[in-house]
Amino acid sequence: MKNLKKLIIITGPSGVGKGTVIKELLDRNKDIWLSISATTRNPRVGEKDDLNYYFIGEERFKDMIDKKEFLEWAQFAGNYYGTPLSTVNEKIEKGFIVLLEIEVEGAKQIKEKFPESLSIFLLPPSKEELEKRIRNRGTEKEEAIDRRLSRANYEIASSNQFDFVLTNHDVDETVKEVLKIIKS
């Protein structure tokens, strides 16, 4: 892969605001492209192939694994998820900054394989604020919230393994900081 300085990893615990920060980054900078993952799971209501995910069959996914066509991949909840290498390469060659919004373990894998890539870990202002954000989504049962919070503690403890650590107090300020890092 060429010019890995244009490969930006954004990670952090669930509820930290990765999606919100990334949406703002994309709105403010047309040179940034958000990588689309491939998955074997079925599309959810409103999701579109080639926009939200590349929806592919398990046989094709496993074939892509065998051919080493993923930047990273994982199996989660009975489905496969991965970042297709060809699309990332194509966008970098066209001059885009490629952004990966990825969970912490996947981010560590990519950073290990491609140390020249740039990794940014987003922290919540506090554990209390993180819990509030997760609860305010209103989409999860207590047991799932507890799992997310427990996982967040583990992930936050590994934040020192990333190039930059930013606390997401305010989306606008966080976006400005990320843009400053990307452009430096």
From Swiss-Prot:
Subcellular locations according to the entry: Cytoplasm
CDD domains according to UniProt: GMPK
Record carries keyword Transcription: no
Binding site for ATP: 12-19
GO CC field: cytosol
Domain of life: Bacteria
Domain Guanylate kinase-like: 5-183
GO MF, one annotated term: guanylate kinase activity
Gene3D superfamilies linked: Guanylate Kinase phosphate binding domain, P-loop containing nucleotide triphosphate hydrolases
Pfam families linked: Guanylate_kin
Record carries keyword ATP-binding: yes
Main location: cytoplasm
Known EC number: 2.7.4.8
Catalytic reaction equation(s): GMP + ATP = GDP + ADP
Keywords attached to this entry: ATP-binding, Cytoplasm, Kinase, Nucleotide-binding, Transferase
PANTHER family found in the cross-reference section: GUANYLATE KINASE (PTHR23117:SF13), GUANYLATE KINASE-RELATED (PTHR23117)
Primary role: Essential for recycling GMP and indirectly, cGMP.
Family (UniProt): Belongs to the guanylate kinase family.
Protein name: Guanylate kinase
Taxonomic source organism: Prochlorococcus marinus subsp. pastoris (strain CCMP1986 / NIES-2087 / MED4)
